[in-house]
């Protein structure tokens, strides 16, 4: 946790957030006052050649590390030490502040600039007084409800922005200069298709080196092992590097009656030779964790799984377990998920991106789209122009009901997609596949890692995501798409075999880490107390219309309930204990009736 404020010395020093967890450092230059509040988990503060060096790192740093990173940043605008997640350089005399956010993301960089003052913080709560109190930005709500997150630099709070991963910020607040945001993403030269074995060797080398660094911490490490391919590979890498780990998974058997997730995880743990535990939640456990997780993440928590992981971090880890390894980001960096179908249909997509292609092919494909989802997929617009309503980028990862959101809020499509469009316009020269990968990594993947990292941080844990290692991301983002996406999971399955995992694990399908909508979305389901409570903020009939098994409407309900809880705790500052008491009371009343 870190808070840095640069302000004009002539204006006098303003009050700073108060917390017993944070140590305060204050420095005065010729024109500026710099105030830094930092804790001991991620934060670092030092100096080099008269400049203040600060930020957040997932591993300890010494003075030489800081000066080396400052030299890298001066030379290239990048920081080569991949453990540094946020890097800040401040000139104490002029007040100029420069920030780089690691390509891997993970730690948020929130910022606000006012008259003669600039503030960077890892937590929006630290900015509360600087922005005159936290308020929901109503214009951001449509995008939030459809996609479950916001594309940076936008946040759900008015007056607070967020630096995208792999971007740099430069501000000189004492001169009134607006913050300048610049992307450091560069594909460089595309690696031509080579032997898959060469790619596997390089990927294994990077992952093993990343894991070996964890071993240096000499503290207990926990691996979140779902039993799927992504987490099993990380387990195999830990085994190969002799990193002692305990594996852990979550279950929702008490609610769903389905123990498949636990059996999946246990079979992988047995093969890896790990001691494995399953943390099982009840319905009330989940509801309480949902409340706590939104408070800790300081935003809607995107995935239903986030509530499960929050409970696992709080109650399922050993007291000495400081580091937690998570397999998030594998799909997007290895070309899984949507990419194999995009690659296999690339020639059709290229044709449909032209005027004549749309004019000729669309009428032919339309009758088949009602029976075949793959054909419907192709009917999206794939043209270079981002002005079309049915563009593929607007439907990708659109979990909520766009039609409902537009009607309910009385807005056009631009209110939903402007964040995505503004982000994509910065990368106009990029190939369609590369744009898709970067949007997913900088949006959905980054939001997920940021939220899960903050849930771990709230319990004193550092959550590591080896698949988001910048060296690995750089290598795989520049690897040709034919090697990555021609065959689904080709690289991951090959990596699993190289690491000695049996074929049944190397080829097993992904299982959901969450729980089906029938347990929470329908009237009388798990979320009914929250639906009743949210009726004070939203039309009860509208909420009831979303209590259905129709996926997009159920996800819109999930988004509204997240938004309601975020507003209650973060804006109105109602305590989580009071919210939990009301949940218990409403459940008891419902059961009595």
Give the positions of each predicted feature.
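Active-site-adjacent bridging/hinge elements
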Residues: 181, 281-290, 445-450, 534-544
